[in-house]
Amino acid sequence: MLTELLSFRGRYKILHMTWFAFFLSFVVWFNLAPLATAIKADFGLDEGQIRTIAICNVALTVPARVIIGMLLDRYGPRLTYSLLLIYAAIPCVAFAAAQNFGQLVAARLALSIVGAGFVIGIRMTAEWFPPKEIGLAEGIYGGWGNFGSAFSAFTLVGVASFLSFFPGAFPVPDGPLLNWRFAIAATGIIAALYGILYYFSVEDTPPGRVYQRPRSARGIEVTTVRDFWFLMLMNVPLSGILMVLAWRLMKVGFFSPTAFTIAIIALIGLYLFQAYNCWVVNKDLLAGRKQYSAEDRYAFKQVAILELTYIVNFGSELAVVSMLPAFFEGTFGLSKALAGMLAASYAFMNLVARPGGGLISDKLGSRKMTMGVLTLCMGIGYLVMSSIPSIRDALGGGGAFMVVLALILTMSCSFFVQAGEGSTFAIVPLIKRRITGQVAGNVGAYGNVGAVAYLTLYSLLPDGDIGNRIFFQTLGIAALIVAFLCFFILKEPKGSFAEFHEGESEVVAAHGHTSTLPEDQSARIL
């Protein structure tokens, strides 16, 4: 596979076009932070208002990932991804044209939906690659696409500066002239144009394969009554974390106490609506009118553990990326620019670490053990990072050697975090194929749940070394607990290293093919 990766034919064309779709969705989703200073100065916003806009940037991502997962399973990744990328232009242009704080907030809320794009490519990639190669393929998709956030951070200021000759440029205090409006609008327009190209360039499945759809996309289909109640329990944090976001909006003064109460009632209603839809999907099972054969069953605890792994890896990544520049600046007395450059090393690891985690999962012969070992190493890495201030004090200060040592520790920990993400989504497509989109949506949503929970905790901790130490210790202990669950409760998925996906041979036989589809893929499609 590695030697064929450079080709742009067959399934590799699909992989490259899909990771780039994810890349663009993250460029759009993360286009606020690099230009926040210019936006703040242009509108005369205070720090609380900027934080409110930042909260709105993630507010709807959690429910959007769940809903996108449902749409994905019903309509297929080709149409779903194309429409999401085309949609991205609307809130981007609206944000760029905003004339007051309220319009900025509304546009950013609408734009937070774009952050759900990751889920779509998980199923698209799984449709084109056999189980034995799914880890590396999903890792490349996730790792290279995720780099869109770093690309946005490094390039948008330059783009805004280049576009400064257009009307609407605004001089940043003690900085260059930036046309942030054109820069943000451009990201959305480029995404929309690529969405059109994507629709006419890809297919949902290879030739001869039928796209498997769930019996209903209104909620996750489970195969035992006990799993239904487990599903209800695991849906609670998805609404609960939105309540935390509503509370944070009240704390910064955007919500009044009355508006906060209304939001809580609405979110309780959202949970009940979701529960009702899950009941509709599974009512025959609950009433005893339907039973699943042993071959058609799956254990929902598999999904639950993957949701927890994504909390401790992707959730912690988003949280750490947000606080790491301030951590380096405060711990070692560095300038903001240098601290930001050092912190960027954490995100850069995505290019190799996430595919690396998927490749390890493919090659070691046990996806379960790979997940457990990577999560264990991640937990140890965070605990070591919590001791950086103590090591600094023991060595007598924050000289160049200590900064380099801290950077090495950070990048090492980052590798295990992002490799763990790759390992997580090496398992997700193997749980139950016809509901892969919904499983990916829920697991992905839990990553955002973790990020909001960790950042909320961080905002409540004391400033300085004590708060940083508690924060990293919390990340480390949470990872160690989840590693235990991976070792002793997570089960190896059926057909983890098979030549074809669940039910594939029957589908192929029905269409008159005499050889397995992966062989057709490698020999004929390419």
Question: Each predicted region: which residue ranges?
Answer:
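Cytoplasmic helix-loop-helix junction between adjacent transmembrane helices
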Residues: 107-144
